[in-house]
Amino acid sequence: MFAPLLKKLFGSKNEREVKRMLKTVQLVNAFEEKMVALSDDQLRAKTAEFKDRIAKGETLDQLLPEAFAVAREAGKRVMGMRHFDVQLIGGMTLHEGKIAEMRTGEGKTLVGTLGVYLNALSGKGVHVVTVNDYLARRDANWMRPLYEFLGLSVGIVTPFQPPEEKRAAYAADITYGTNNEFGFDYLRDNMAFSMEEKFQRELNFAVIDEVDSILIDEARTPLIISGQAEDSSRLYIEINKLIPKLKLHVEEVEGEVTQEGHYTVDEKTRQVELNEAGHQFIEDQLTSIGLLAEGESLYSAHNLSLLTHVYAGLRAHKLFHRNVEYIVQDGQVVLVDEHTGRTMPGRRLSEGLHQAIEAKENLNIQAESQTLASTTFQNYFRLYDKLSGMTGTADTEAFEFHQIYGLQVVVIPTNKPLARKDYNDLVFLTAEEKYAAIVNDIKESMAAGRPVLVGTATIETSEHMSALLEKEGIEHKVLNAKFHEKEAEIIAQAGRPGALTIATNMAGRGTDILLGGNWEVEVASLENPTPEQIAQIKADWQKRHQQVLESGGLQVIASERHESRRIDNQLRGRAGRQGDAGSSRFYLSLEDSLMRIFASDRVKNFMKALGMQSGEAIEHRMVTNAIEKAQRKVEGRNFDIRKQLLEFDDVNNEQRKVIYHMRNTLLAADNIGETIADFRQDVLNATVSAHIPPQSLPEQWDVAGLEASIASDFGVKLPIQQWLDEDDHLYEETLREKLMNELIAAYNEKEDQAGAEALRSFEKQIVLRVLDDLWKDHLSTMDHLRHGIHLRGYAQKNPKQEYKRESFTLFSELLDSIKRDSIRVLSHVQVRREDPAEEEQRLRQEAEALAARMQFEHAEAPGLEAQPELVGEEVDVALAAAPVRNEQKLGRNELCYCGSGKKFKHCHGQIQ
């Protein structure tokens, strides 16, 4: 009730933030005259002066006004660009660890230099994160002259980079790279076998460009390093033959069955389910081809893998469509990003889904993979001491940024007032009528000399639009996932008079559409252009620029609404950059997926009740409200999925922190003798307690079992029964002491034989390898736990609490296994004396030999009830890989196959 009044009196929170920063802008401006008077050398010397002042205790906040003034003056001299006052506000927002929302064309890249320069003065490093390698290289090379003028070094991290080159890039003051590369390097560092192999320093400050794309759109997709698992291509091929035989089961709202079938599809959650008839049909089919034993159920424990393959095949056929979710290119299934329309070469769906699509398309089926290390962007970026970001569209997701990352969004005022006109949506009954209206709008705009950008949600739609335009004889360029190599070139010239560009979603994001075209691209295409040629190109561009402005600027036409309002706003933001003229219009139909799935029947009935004729459109607030309500509903559902992923990964993250801390401590230590001694003590205590229960009588002791366990775990045969017979004073505590003394003596004897230096080095390598191997198995176990944990809800149990409880138990067992297996290997192995340099070389060669079987994945995470597809990016890297396992693998906690009655991990599953 009082909120509007208070807002009117005191302004919104955003307005108060901007007003506060304007005071600091005045301080920066006060330094400008002084900076102009400095020579280049004097201006450059300011960087060393600032570093010295920081060393003496001055803070970055205290340096900010003068440092920003230095960066602004350097920008004028080196780049020929002066930071506007609103850009200074953007720089302050970044420095304070917030998100700056800036309209398209307001100079986000230049704004970034302010916060980056100030924070790089600390000497702790700054990471500038972009959405793709092209933008990382472009921005780094664009701003490199400015930073180097100020005495700062710049590095770029890219895939397939030589290790020394990548290490140098991370050692630079400012490092550019993609979110994927920074995340994978973090995982690689935590798989290194020496401190020298690591790349990253402490994670200090990151500036994320297009922060909404990275922290929101890609937040559901974990980063995974994996190795190859067993080959099951025949299974995919056989099941692929069965899926087309299944029929869709359809029910009306009242529950009346209109079509009997085997499976149902929920388009909202993108899930497909077999019904009872479907299960029976599949079981009969699998039995007939020999994949399922007679009378067995798909739900038997040993058939769950088969059930997973069936569902993968079903989803591949019914939920994934060629030229929508993926394309086939060079004999491979290439995924398409639903948010940008870009292809994602190398990225693969997991849980067998990618292989199922390959089988569906009759392509070569690639092997599945096993997780070796993983994290999420949510948890990776929260490792930075300070995080900030820039984007043109963040305000609609402000709640999520604050809830998940603790980041505040500040909307930065535009340098010039926004002149773009955003027209109301036009809604048609059918898609055919909608497309006809779009073509008419295009003709009118082009006749007026306006450039036109048509945004589509899928490749299929863009190709359909292209076909319609070709039929009309209208010249145009298509920018979608199939032609993304030409993105920058096409987008750069999309602002020419009468130019028509069809773009899938936000393809080409990061490159501005300049009215009249981009004259710099024209100059760059010439070989050794003369000053006269450059002047002529500029003059021609100026004429075109003025012509487009007078005709009304860029016209943005959207062929449908996206699930997210933010993506719609990004498309609108293509027009009207830096106060230019422009307009936008969305064309919709009741056949659009968003309207069909989420808009209520009431809206459809309302439109039909109006008696609309063919080709007529409606502009009504009720329809617009219904669309926005549907978008909010989808955004809320997607937020819940991302939040759920984080809640589950937070459990994994705490375990990840413990393991990675243990690993880094081992790597940094020259001597881990104390750690080995602690392991030995813990393993012995656990072994004794297992055979001598607390407060038990000697008659209850399992002495024979204790002797066998000591021999198995420590490689020493001790006559414990004989000791007890000969010494009446041996009770539980004194027996532990005697056992420990014997074990230490045996280990010291091994050390005398091998040499202390050789054994110390060997200890570290063995513990690291045991830790990595068991951690890999633990990750696999945790994955299986998470996939099935939602079923606990049927037993009236909280799945999240159950997951936390069971994962804690599994992690405790993991830590025990690391100790036991490390001691077991060290106790049994025979260490020979060898030159330490030779040993290091041997280990390095071993790691390189295994590297070919490593993969990178950027995978879509499963939810609880709905389990979305897992997306992964597979790239060869120079890291030690897991061995390929072709045999059936027993779980660590299953009974051993030898019949001993022990768990597999405590018997033949221990490292030999």
UniProtKB/Swiss-Prot annotation:
This is Protein translocase subunit SecA. It is found in: Cell inner membrane; Cytoplasm. Monomer and homodimer. Part of the essential Sec protein translocation apparatus which comprises SecA, SecYEG and auxiliary proteins SecDF-YajC and YidC. The gene is secA. PANTHER family: CHLOROPLAST PROTEIN-TRANSPORTING ATPASE, SECA INNER MEMBRANE COMPONENT OF SEC PROTEIN SECRETION SYSTEM. Zn(2+) binds at residues 896, 898, 907-908. Part of the Sec protein translocase complex. Interacts with the SecYEG preprotein conducting channel. Has a central role in coupling the hydrolysis of ATP to the transfer of proteins into and across the cell membrane, serving both as a receptor for the preprotein-SecB complex and as an ATP-driven molecular motor driving the stepwise translocation of polypeptide chains across the membrane. CDD domains: DEXDc_SecA, SF2_C_secA. SMART domains: SecA_DEAD (SM00957), SecA_PP_bind (SM00958). ATP binds at residues 87, 105-109, 512. It catalyses: ATP + H2O + cellular proteinSide 1 = ADP + phosphate + cellular proteinSide 2.
